[in-house]
């Protein structure tokens, strides 16, 4: 801080105050930069990738990601970071510190950004909108992953079989096919699952819990994904379009089945006669011919 700035504050002079949040600044230029937060204006652009920021200090920090320089190293595990605040956040993994606590449910987080994102599960806020289909998301990373559906990008590849996925979570789910690991077991019926979320959804079969209710007709569902698909029956939304013929579908799984018409893929083969089918339901129906 300059001597003039110090004198201004110590003398009780007129610092520059933000009209939105009341934060005080010793220079008008600092106030102007701060106000970009509220206006969401991002006048500072990275020359390398074009990413824009509200303050100059953030673009300077960001530019270190292009240089590859990582000056800040963790003394516990040796991992290095290009920015000091990223190191400080990382070190909380080792200390177990979670200073940001949700007032609604008490869950604590390492980063404030994670708390803000979590709080949207209580408020239902989904501020990130897909420009292609209008679907909304609570986090920007969720939107980014979703957008890969529209561009057909599949950057996550299985090392075992080569199957590629648009989202990392789907690759992780898929990999359990190869390992066969199912560590999550239902106390009611003993059925085991490879993922905890799958167990939680399954338990609702026993409890009858249906926490996701349609605002239009009141129908309730055990899974949020089921509610999302159901709502499209009211809105008529069909976000999944076929690149071959243009036909659109309300569910991605339905699009995947439809695509087999164009590719000719028939993964379900009858063990009795060898006839192959593109859909599992057709395969099951066919097998009844042999049992009768």
From Swiss-Prot:
<keyword id="KW-1017">Isopeptide bond</keyword>
<feature type="region of interest" description="Interaction with TERF2IP">
    <location>
        <begin position="212"/>
        <end position="292"/>
    </location>
</feature>
<keyword id="KW-0539">Nucleus</keyword>
<keyword id="KW-0479">Metal-binding</keyword>
<feature type="zinc finger region" description="C2H2-type 10">
    <location>
        <begin position="268"/>
        <end position="290"/>
    </location>
</feature>
<dbReference type="Pfam" id="PF00096">
    <property type="entry name" value="zf-C2H2"/>
</dbReference>
<dbReference type="GO" id="GO:0003677">
    <property type="term" value="F:DNA binding"/>
</dbReference>
<dbReference type="GO" id="GO:0005829">
    <property type="term" value="C:cytosol"/>
</dbReference>
<feature type="zinc finger region" description="C2H2-type 7">
    <location>
        <begin position="184"/>
        <end position="206"/>
    </location>
</feature>
<keyword id="KW-0863">Zinc-finger</keyword>
<feature type="zinc finger region" description="C2H2-type 8">
    <location>
        <begin position="212"/>
        <end position="234"/>
    </location>
</feature>
<comment type="subunit">
    <text>Binds DNA. Interacts with SUMO conjugating enzyme UBC9/UBE2I. Interacts with the telomeric protein TERF2IP.</text>
</comment>
<keyword id="KW-0238">DNA-binding</keyword>
<feature type="cross-link" description="Glycyl lysine isopeptide (Lys-Gly) (interchain with G-Cter in SUMO2)">
    <location>
        <position position="28"/>
    </location>
</feature>
<keyword id="KW-0677">Repeat</keyword>
<feature type="zinc finger region" description="C2H2-type 9">
    <location>
        <begin position="240"/>
        <end position="262"/>
    </location>
</feature>
<dbReference type="GO" id="GO:0005730">
    <property type="term" value="C:nucleolus"/>
</dbReference>
<feature type="cross-link" description="Glycyl lysine isopeptide (Lys-Gly) (interchain with G-Cter in SUMO)">
    <location>
        <position position="157"/>
    </location>
</feature>
<keyword id="KW-0862">Zinc</keyword>
<feature type="zinc finger region" description="C2H2-type 3">
    <location>
        <begin position="72"/>
        <end position="94"/>
    </location>
</feature>
<feature type="cross-link" description="Glycyl lysine isopeptide (Lys-Gly) (interchain with G-Cter in SUMO)">
    <location>
        <position position="169"/>
    </location>
</feature>
<comment type="similarity">
    <text>Belongs to the krueppel C2H2-type zinc-finger protein family.</text>
</comment>
<feature type="cross-link" description="Glycyl lysine isopeptide (Lys-Gly) (interchain with G-Cter in SUMO2)">
    <location>
        <position position="56"/>
    </location>
</feature>
<feature type="cross-link" description="Glycyl lysine isopeptide (Lys-Gly) (interchain with G-Cter in SUMO2)">
    <location>
        <position position="51"/>
    </location>
</feature>
<feature type="zinc finger region" description="C2H2-type 2">
    <location>
        <begin position="44"/>
        <end position="66"/>
    </location>
</feature>
<dbReference type="InterPro" id="IPR036236">
    <property type="entry name" value="Znf_C2H2_sf"/>
</dbReference>
<dbReference type="InterPro" id="IPR013087">
    <property type="entry name" value="Znf_C2H2_type"/>
</dbReference>
<feature type="zinc finger region" description="C2H2-type 6">
    <location>
        <begin position="156"/>
        <end position="178"/>
    </location>
</feature>
<feature type="zinc finger region" description="C2H2-type 4">
    <location>
        <begin position="100"/>
        <end position="122"/>
    </location>
</feature>
<protein>
    <recommendedName>
        <fullName>Zinc finger protein OZF</fullName>
    </recommendedName>
</protein>
<keyword id="KW-0832">Ubl conjugation</keyword>
<feature type="zinc finger region" description="C2H2-type 5">
    <location>
        <begin position="128"/>
        <end position="150"/>
    </location>
</feature>
<feature type="zinc finger region" description="C2H2-type 1">
    <location>
        <begin position="16"/>
        <end position="38"/>
    </location>
</feature>
<feature type="cross-link" description="Glycyl lysine isopeptide (Lys-Gly) (interchain with G-Cter in SUMO2)">
    <location>
        <position position="173"/>
    </location>
</feature>
<dbReference type="GO" id="GO:0008270">
    <property type="term" value="F:zinc ion binding"/>
</dbReference>
């Amino acid at each position: 801080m300059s001597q003039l700035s110090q004198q201004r504050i110590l003398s009780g002079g007129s610092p520059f105050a933000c009209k939105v949040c009341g934060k005080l600044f010793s220079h008008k230029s600092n106030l102007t930069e701060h106000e970009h937060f509220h206006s969401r204006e991002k006048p500072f652009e990275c020359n390398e990738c074009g990413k824009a920021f509200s303050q100059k200090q953030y673009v300077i920090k960001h530019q270190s990601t292009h240089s590859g320089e990582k000056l800040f190293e963790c003394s516990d595990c040796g991992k290095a970071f290009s920015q000091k605040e990223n190191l400080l956040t990382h070190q909380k993994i080792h200390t177990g510190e979670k200073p940001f606590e949700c007032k609604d449910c008490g869950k604590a987080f390492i980063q404030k950004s994670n708390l803000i994102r979590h709080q949207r599960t209580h408020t239902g806020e989904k501020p990130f909108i897909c420009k292609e289909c209008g679907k909304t998301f609570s986090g920007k990373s969720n939107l980014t992953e979703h957008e890969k559906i529209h561009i057909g990008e599949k950057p996550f590849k299985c090392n075992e079989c080569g199957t590629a996925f648009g989202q990392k979570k789907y690759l992780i789910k898929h990999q359990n096919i190869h390992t066969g690991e199912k560590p999550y077991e239902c106390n009611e019926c003993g059925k085991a699952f490879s993922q905890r979320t799958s167990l939680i959804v399954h338990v609702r079969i026993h409890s009858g819990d249906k926490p996701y209710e349609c605002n239009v007709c009141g129908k309730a569902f055990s899974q949020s994904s089921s509610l999302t698909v159901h709502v499209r029956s009211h809105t008529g939304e069909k976000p999944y379009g076929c690149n071959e013929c243009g036909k659109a579908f309300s569910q991605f799984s339905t699009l995947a089945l439809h695509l087999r018409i164009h590719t000719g893929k028939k993964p379900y083969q009858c063990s009795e006669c060898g006839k192959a089918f593109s859909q599992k339901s057709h395969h099951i129906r066919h097998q009844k011919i042999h049992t009768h």
